[in-house]
């Protein structure tokens, strides 16, 4: 009475006759009988009968559901007790229709049918036994639970996938945490999300990206997967001339993000590349890098302090790959599916000791060392605190356009600020980065008789990690993979193009928990909403691709690219 009934009665009084003030969900109280059935149950029902407004749904439709377990009376005795008292059922009993109406749920000792310890998977012969029980309970229209079962995330997801209705747990806070925000932990192409509506976002983005509107939950789905491009492997890993370099950076893209997208789509163009390495990506002043230090290391071949953009600890600018190729008379392109003043793209054209110094970084564009810049972020050009009419200054050298579609039509150097590139990837715009990549390649090829350099960033894989949003991560990965496919297609046509794919850091500590290789269903959880120091894959294709195998610091990538340009 003091442990359960009185607190529940108090709760109902405080919440206006329901268990939760702001929810229509009903509370179920399981009462386990340890002593003799009839006298114990008579005492329990007498106590509950004093509060019909709390325990009798005939009086209050929001009343607590009572389910009696343990020493349950024989089915023929169910009628001796008030109608609001329901009972735990036995899956092997053949109940009459009237008796079945008094069954609240079906409970089974897990150990009677399986010795699974919660690791790996249930062996098939035991799973068949469990599924037979589940099917019978559901055939009655009753929920089912297994007691005496193991605990843990693998168990929770396995039971969920099997259709088990109640998770029997001694760690409710852990179990509840696992199922919290469940729609953002699961993804399958062609399937509706488990939750719709609202926005999944994060407050962990930096100054230039903090206005990102987030991932629209009702759009975090794809009706079909993307095509996977199989390269011809023309000159792959050979000693041929490297004339062009396409450098693709998946911001926040770790191995788990790649694998999740691979299983969901049943293949990736990125994983068709045969030459692979691993890069270490620690910042100079911290174990875990930010995008400034990580992107700058990829751009310059030098280690950086966090927040520094292509600039030493002492404030000396480091030349980037863009400078290297520009000085060789080769056109340079910087393309991002995000803000052009964010850390990774600015590492390829700007210099600053503070990544948030957007005014200082974008002023570097006036040096004219980039032939093509494409991304979002018009406010960085129009809402300035330095008083510079940056668009006016840049128009002395560049065509300043507002749509990716306009890039190819312009003859000279182009800055394209297309605000649609600030949106999260979804079905309607999934090919946007790939389209921009194709247009950028065509533009630079027209200008570059000696060859060209193009950096392409998939920016929002990082945003999805900060938001702990697996559907967002997979869809952004597929958007990025389409851009990789465009680079590989051009490399096959051209024969003198090196393609390098990597990341600046991993975001979120994504761990894949379960999935289904046949259907493409993937389930994963994030251990953080920040960057992690995980080593990152490097993929290479084309002449010189074999130079990117092995394990090395991220600074080696830019150095090896430069070593291949004669």
Q: Which residue stretches match the model-derived regions?
A:
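Second-shell loop/turn segments in exported
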Residues: 28-36, 118-123, 133, 146, ...
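Metal-dependent active-site segment of extracytoplasmic phospho-/sulfohydrolases and closely related
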Residues: 255, 480-517
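A Trp-anchored, charged/polar loop motif used as the substrate-binding/catalytic surface
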Residues: 7-15, 87-91, 399-401, 429-446
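Generic beta-strand/beta-sheet core signal
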Residues: 147, 170, 248, 335, ...
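Active-site His/acidic residue clusters
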Residues: 343-349, 422-423, 448-451, 455-483
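Loop/turn elements at helix/coil->beta-strand transitions in domains of secreted/extracellular proteins
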Residues: 25-28, 60-65, 138-145, 162-164, ...
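Catalytic cores of phosphodiester-bond hydrolases, prominently lipid phosphodiesterases
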Residues: 2-191
């Amino acid at each position: 009475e003091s442990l359960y009934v009185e607190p529940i009665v108090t709760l109902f009084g405080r919440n206006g006759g329901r268990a939760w003030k702001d929810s229509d969900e009903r509370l179920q109280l399981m009462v386990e009988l340890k002593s003799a059935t009839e006298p114990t149950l008579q005492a329990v029902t007498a106590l509950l009968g004093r509060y019909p407004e709390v325990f009798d749904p005939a009086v209050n439709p929001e009343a607590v559901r009572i389910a009696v377990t343990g020493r349950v009376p024989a089915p023929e005795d169910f009628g001796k007790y008030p109608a609001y008292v329901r009972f735990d059922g036995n899956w092997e009993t053949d109940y009459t229709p009237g008796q079945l109406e008094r069954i609240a749920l079906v409970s089974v000792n897990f150990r009677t049918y399986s010795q699974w310890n919660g690791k790996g998977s249930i062996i098939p012969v035991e799973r068949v036994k469990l599924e037979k029980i589940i099917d019978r309970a559901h055939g009655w229209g009753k929920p089912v639970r297994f007691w005496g079962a193991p605990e843990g995330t693998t168990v929770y997801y396995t039971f969920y996938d099997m259709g088990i209705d109640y998770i029997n747990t001694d760690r409710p806070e852990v179990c509840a945490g696992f199922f919290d925000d469940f729609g953002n932990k699961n993804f399958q192409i062609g399937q509706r999300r488990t939750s719709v509506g609202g926005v999944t976002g994060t407050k962990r983005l930096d100054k230039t990206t903090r206005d990102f509107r987030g991932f629209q939950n009702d759009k975090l789905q794809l009706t079909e997967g993307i095509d996977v491009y199989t390269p011809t492997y023309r000159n792959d890993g050979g000693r041929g001339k490297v004339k062009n370099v396409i450098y693709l950076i998946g911001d926040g893209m770790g191995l788990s993000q790649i694998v999740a997208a691979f299983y969901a789509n049943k293949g990736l163009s990125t994983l068709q590349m045969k030459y692979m390495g691993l890069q270490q990506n620690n910042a100079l002043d911290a174990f875990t890098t930010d995008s400034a230090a990580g992107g700058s290391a990829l751009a310059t071949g030098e280690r950086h302090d966090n927040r520094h953009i292509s600039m030493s600890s002492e404030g000396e600018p480091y030349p980037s790959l863009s400078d290297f190729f520009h000085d060789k008379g080769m056109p340079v392109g910087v393309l991002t599916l995000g803000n052009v003043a964010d850390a990774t793209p600015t590492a390829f054209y700007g210099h600053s000791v503070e990544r948030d110094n957007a005014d200082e970084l974008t002023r570097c564009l006036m040096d004219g060392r980039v032939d093509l810049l494409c991304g979002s972020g018009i406010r960085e050009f129009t809402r300035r605190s330095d008083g510079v009419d940056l668009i006016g200054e840049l128009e002395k050298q560049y065509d300043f356009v507002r749509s990716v579609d306009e890039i190819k039509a312009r003859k000279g150097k182009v800055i394209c600020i297309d605000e649609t590139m600030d949106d999260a990837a979804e079905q309607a715009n999934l090919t946007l980065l790939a389209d921009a990549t194709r247009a950028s390649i065509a533009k630079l090829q027209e200008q570059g008789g000696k060859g060209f350099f193009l950096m392409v960033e998939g920016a929002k894989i990082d945003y999805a990690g900060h938001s702990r949003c697996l559907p967002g991560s997979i869809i952004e990965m597929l958007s990025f993979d389409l851009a990789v496919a465009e680079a590989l297609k051009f490399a096959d046509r051209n024969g003198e193009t090196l393609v390098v794919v990597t990341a600046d850091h991993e975001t979120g500590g994504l761990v894949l928990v379960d999935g289904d290789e046949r259907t493409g269903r993937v389930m994963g959880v994030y251990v953080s909403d920040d960057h992690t120091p995980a080593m990152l894959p490097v993929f290479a294709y084309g002449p010189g691709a074999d130079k990117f195998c092995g394990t090395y610091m991220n600074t080696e990538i830019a150095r090896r690219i430069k070593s291949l340009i004669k």
